[in-house]
Amino acid sequence: MIQVKNFHKTYRETVAVQDLSFEVEPGEILGLVGPNGAGKTSTLRCIAGIIPPTSGKLVVAGHDIVADPIAAKRKLAYVPDDPKLFDTLTIWEHLEFVAAAYRVTDWRERGELLLQRHDLTAKRNTVAQELSRGMRQKVAICCAYLHDPQVLMFDEPHVGLDPRGIRLMKDSIIERAKLGASIVVSSHLLNEVEDMCSRLLILHKGKCLFFGRMDEARTTFAGERGDASLEEIFFHATEGSEETASTLS
């Protein structure tokens, strides 16, 4: 489970995220959407314990990420939009490294299945610097799954993937949710978010415009349009926010 309460993040004089609160239950997939600069990546990086929050409470699988970061990080995995791999390690050596870091002893069979699932078996002995952008993304996803985390966060996971890769990635995320993981997916591919996610969080200029179920978002931003797409909801929400700000100013 992920619990975020009254979360703020500032960089010097810049407010990146302001008073954000939300929860992601086990088995849920939350779609985190917003324009560039909305605060999405800052939110994910703070929850993952990569950068500290300015204030607020961030709890991952029952552990406060600030007060108890080691315990929290054992339960989570974060896949950034541009995964940093070790150039001279092979794909299999990356899995071996992650298994050692998380003290996973029975990882080899799981690793083989992950490589097979993501079409990486034939490349298992290839070093990272020789991999395409999409393959590097797949390696990062396999590494994220290896220690069977209770919390998973993805920042633009579709980047670099071909259509088959996108399908495999989407199916694997849905499968992880069915197994009980709490998942956040941040993406500009709104149709993919709509396909995967049961709940939605719209960020705009660091503020939460909406948090709730997808059907509630349709009611809020599209009235009686029960068939409104996430793209329509997104533009109704963000453009409406801009109009309100313009009126107030």
Segments from the language model and where they lie:
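Conserved ABC ATPase signature
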Residues: 127-134
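Conserved ABC transporter NBD signature motif
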Residues: 56-67, 71-72
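Helical segment within the ABC ATPase nucleotide-binding domain
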Residues: 166-179
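Catalytic Walker B motif of ABC-type/P-loop ATPase nucleotide-binding domains
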Residues: 152-156
